[in-house]
Amino acid sequence: MVGYIGNVDIGVFDAEVANSISAELERQNTLLQMIASENFVSRAVLQAQGSVLTNKYAEGYAGSRYYCGCALVDVVENLAVERLCRLFGCKFANVQPHSGSQANQQVFMALLKPGDTILGMSLDCGGHLTHGAAPNVSGRWFNAVSYGVNRDTGLIDMDEVEALALSAKPSLIIAGASSYPRRIDFAAFRAIADKVGAYLLADIAHYSGLIAGGCYPSPFGHAHVVTSTTHKTLRGPRGAVIMTDDEEIHKKIRLSVFPGMQGGPLMHVIAAKAVAFKEALHPDFKLYAQQVLENSRVLAGVLSSEGLDVVTGGTDSHIVLLDLRSKGVTGREVSSSLERAGIVCNKNAVPFDTEKPWVTSGIRLGSAAETSRGLGVPEFESIGRLVAKVVNACSLGQEKMSAAEAEVRREVNGLVRSLPMSAFPVCEVC
């Protein structure tokens, strides 16, 4: 018999990877994780994703697979679909997309032809790469037209959206964003889409957990089709879903996902999605969503009171976007300084940004992950003051910046020690 090392622990077989995992757990446990697209999943979600379902190949859909032995994974996928539809009150759902980008591409494949016109939010005003950005396939395969925000308010300019739609006659309009902190008027977008005979795609990747928790407007009843990732405010594994109330669109989506763009689904991830959807259906998730929103609003208020420029003047979501141009520093400089101080966020373009994407004039902060850790209003007030201290020091030279980083790091240590991420299972050999 050929020797098989399948029963050897990772710490014994591959210490390099094991040590990296252990170090990453320590990093997550000892720094403030303020990246808006990240969250902390539960022990149950981790257990599902790390299960033996990773061994099972299951091309096709529940009840119609190309492989035998799929009866049990069919149960899991059906649970995920049923729970997702119940969570958002929709009729049809596909839980197989591997990522949000792929989910959007699968919608394009289902509803569009190469060369069709799409209308989405510009990248610098808060849109996503898949909404028509030039380097992305959405900007290469389609005639991409972009709408933006009002220069004075930072809010989506619906008059511009309508004018562009009437002029460009898009086949698809995308309502959604990756760094837009305010509410999106899905009803207004649908009215514009109807005027030009376009499909409306709502990309709620960032907002889905808040929508599930009743803290952000729902696109259902307005959008023809809805996509979302499952790992941001929804607090599930990394992956995505596509939802609709239209059976004909659902049929097209099914074919677009498989066999159009994917082969075998990741059944261990779908199991983790099912677990996360059950968690989101629990009444406590509404309390979580409410706390996420309250924490982000407190954070925005403190940052504003400390003299920083909060884009749109506040937030209606988990996202707080800072414009650093008045401080004479870049997003790259400030995000690096904050990380040294123990606060992890990301550099981010702000409306009408003239800096390169790898530099930017802003930073994006999010409240979802640290709310999952258990931080509340008092802690987010402290975080706001700590962020402001670092930002203000960045414009005062290296010595003052280093001193501020050291001082803030000590305070961050106190915050995270009080609320360790005890839900995370740690492998003994790691």
Curated annotation (Swiss-Prot):
It comes from the Bacteria. GO terms for biological process: glycine biosynthetic process from serine; tetrahydrofolate interconversion. Its main location: cytoplasm. GO terms for molecular function: glycine hydroxymethyltransferase activity; pyridoxal phosphate binding. Its cofactor is pyridoxal 5'-phosphate. The keyword Ribosomal protein does not apply. InterPro entries: PyrdxlP-dep_Trfase (IPR015424), PyrdxlP-dep_Trfase_major (IPR015421), PyrdxlP-dep_Trfase_small (IPR015422), Ser_HO-MeTrfase (IPR001085), Ser_HO-MeTrfase-like (IPR049943), Ser_HO-MeTrfase_PLP_BS (IPR019798), SHMT-like_dom (IPR039429). Keywords: Amino-acid biosynthesis, Cytoplasm, One-carbon metabolism, Pyridoxal phosphate, Transferase. GO terms for cellular component: cytosol. (6S)-5,6,7,8-tetrahydrofolate binds at residues 123, 127-129, 248. Pathway: One-carbon metabolism; tetrahydrofolate interconversion; Amino-acid biosynthesis; glycine biosynthesis; glycine from L-serine: step 1/1. The record marks 231 as: Plays an important role in substrate specificity. Its EC number is 2.1.2.1. It catalyses: (6R)-5,10-methylene-5,6,7,8-tetrahydrofolate + glycine + H2O = (6S)-5,6,7,8-tetrahydrofolate + L-serine. Belongs to the SHMT family. Homodimer. Catalyzes the reversible interconversion of serine and glycine with tetrahydrofolate (THF) serving as the one-carbon carrier. This reaction serves as the major source of one-carbon groups required for the biosynthesis of purines, thymidylate, methionine, and other important biomolecules. Also exhibits THF-independent aldolase activity toward beta-hydroxyamino acids, producing glycine and aldehydes, via a retro-aldol mechanism. This is Serine hydroxymethyltransferase.
